[in-house]
């Protein structure tokens, strides 16, 4: 578990599935993912995170508010796992923070802690992040974290059909500190 001033970042548990679905499946939260989805799709995401934690020792962890234990969202690191893209095995940082917590610096606090963990616990030369071009809050955070746009690494996400605007990913990276 990672602890910050206001947050706990922890591995997933089976009982997180319905809580995550309720948090993440609103029209605003799913705006840049193509809209709300059935619970089974979010359950599959949680299953992948549990598997990644077991295999790699990290994943995009549950973000909890320390004071209340309430799930605020997701943030952490995973191995990209997108073959046939410019980022097939990148150490990816990502986040999804619930609407109730927007504008409070939760994503930044969780992302900074995740990046610090990544530098301390992996030998990766850089950390990458990607999102759709219209997701200005996400790439704005990437910039505030010190990440740099890498147009040479932009790609089509394999989970989206050709021509689907949600599949056009822009990439930011940050190099390991000296």
Identify the meaning behind each predicted range.
Residues 28-50, 58-61:
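Conserved GNAT-fold acetyl-CoA-binding loop/helix
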Residues 1-31, 62-178:
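Acyl-donor (CoA/ACP) binding surface of acyl/acetyltransferases
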Residues 42-52, 120-128:
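Short, charged, low-hydrophobicity "junction" segments
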């Amino acid at each position: 578990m990672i602890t910050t001033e206001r947050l706990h970042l922890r591995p997933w548990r089976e009982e997180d599935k319905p809580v995550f679905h309720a948090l993440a499946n609103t029209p605003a939260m799913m705006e840049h993912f193509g809209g709300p989805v059935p619970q089974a799709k979010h359950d599959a995401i949680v299953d992948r995170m549990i598997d990644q934690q077991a295999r790699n020792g990290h994943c995009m962890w549950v973000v909890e508010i320390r004071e209340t234990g309430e799930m605020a969202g997701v943030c952490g690191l995973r191995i990209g796992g997108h073959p046939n893209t410019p980022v097939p095995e990148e150490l990816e940082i990502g986040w999804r923070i619930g609407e109730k917590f927007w504008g409070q610096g939760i994503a930044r606090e969780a992302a900074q802690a995740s990046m610090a963990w990544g530098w301390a616990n992996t030998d990766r030369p850089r950390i990458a992040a990607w999102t759709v071009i219209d997701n200005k809050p996400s790439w704005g955070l990437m910039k505030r974290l010190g990440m740099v746009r890498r147009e040479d690494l932009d790609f089509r996400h394999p989970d989206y059909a050709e021509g689907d605007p949600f599949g056009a990913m822009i990439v930011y990276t940050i190099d390991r500190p000296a």
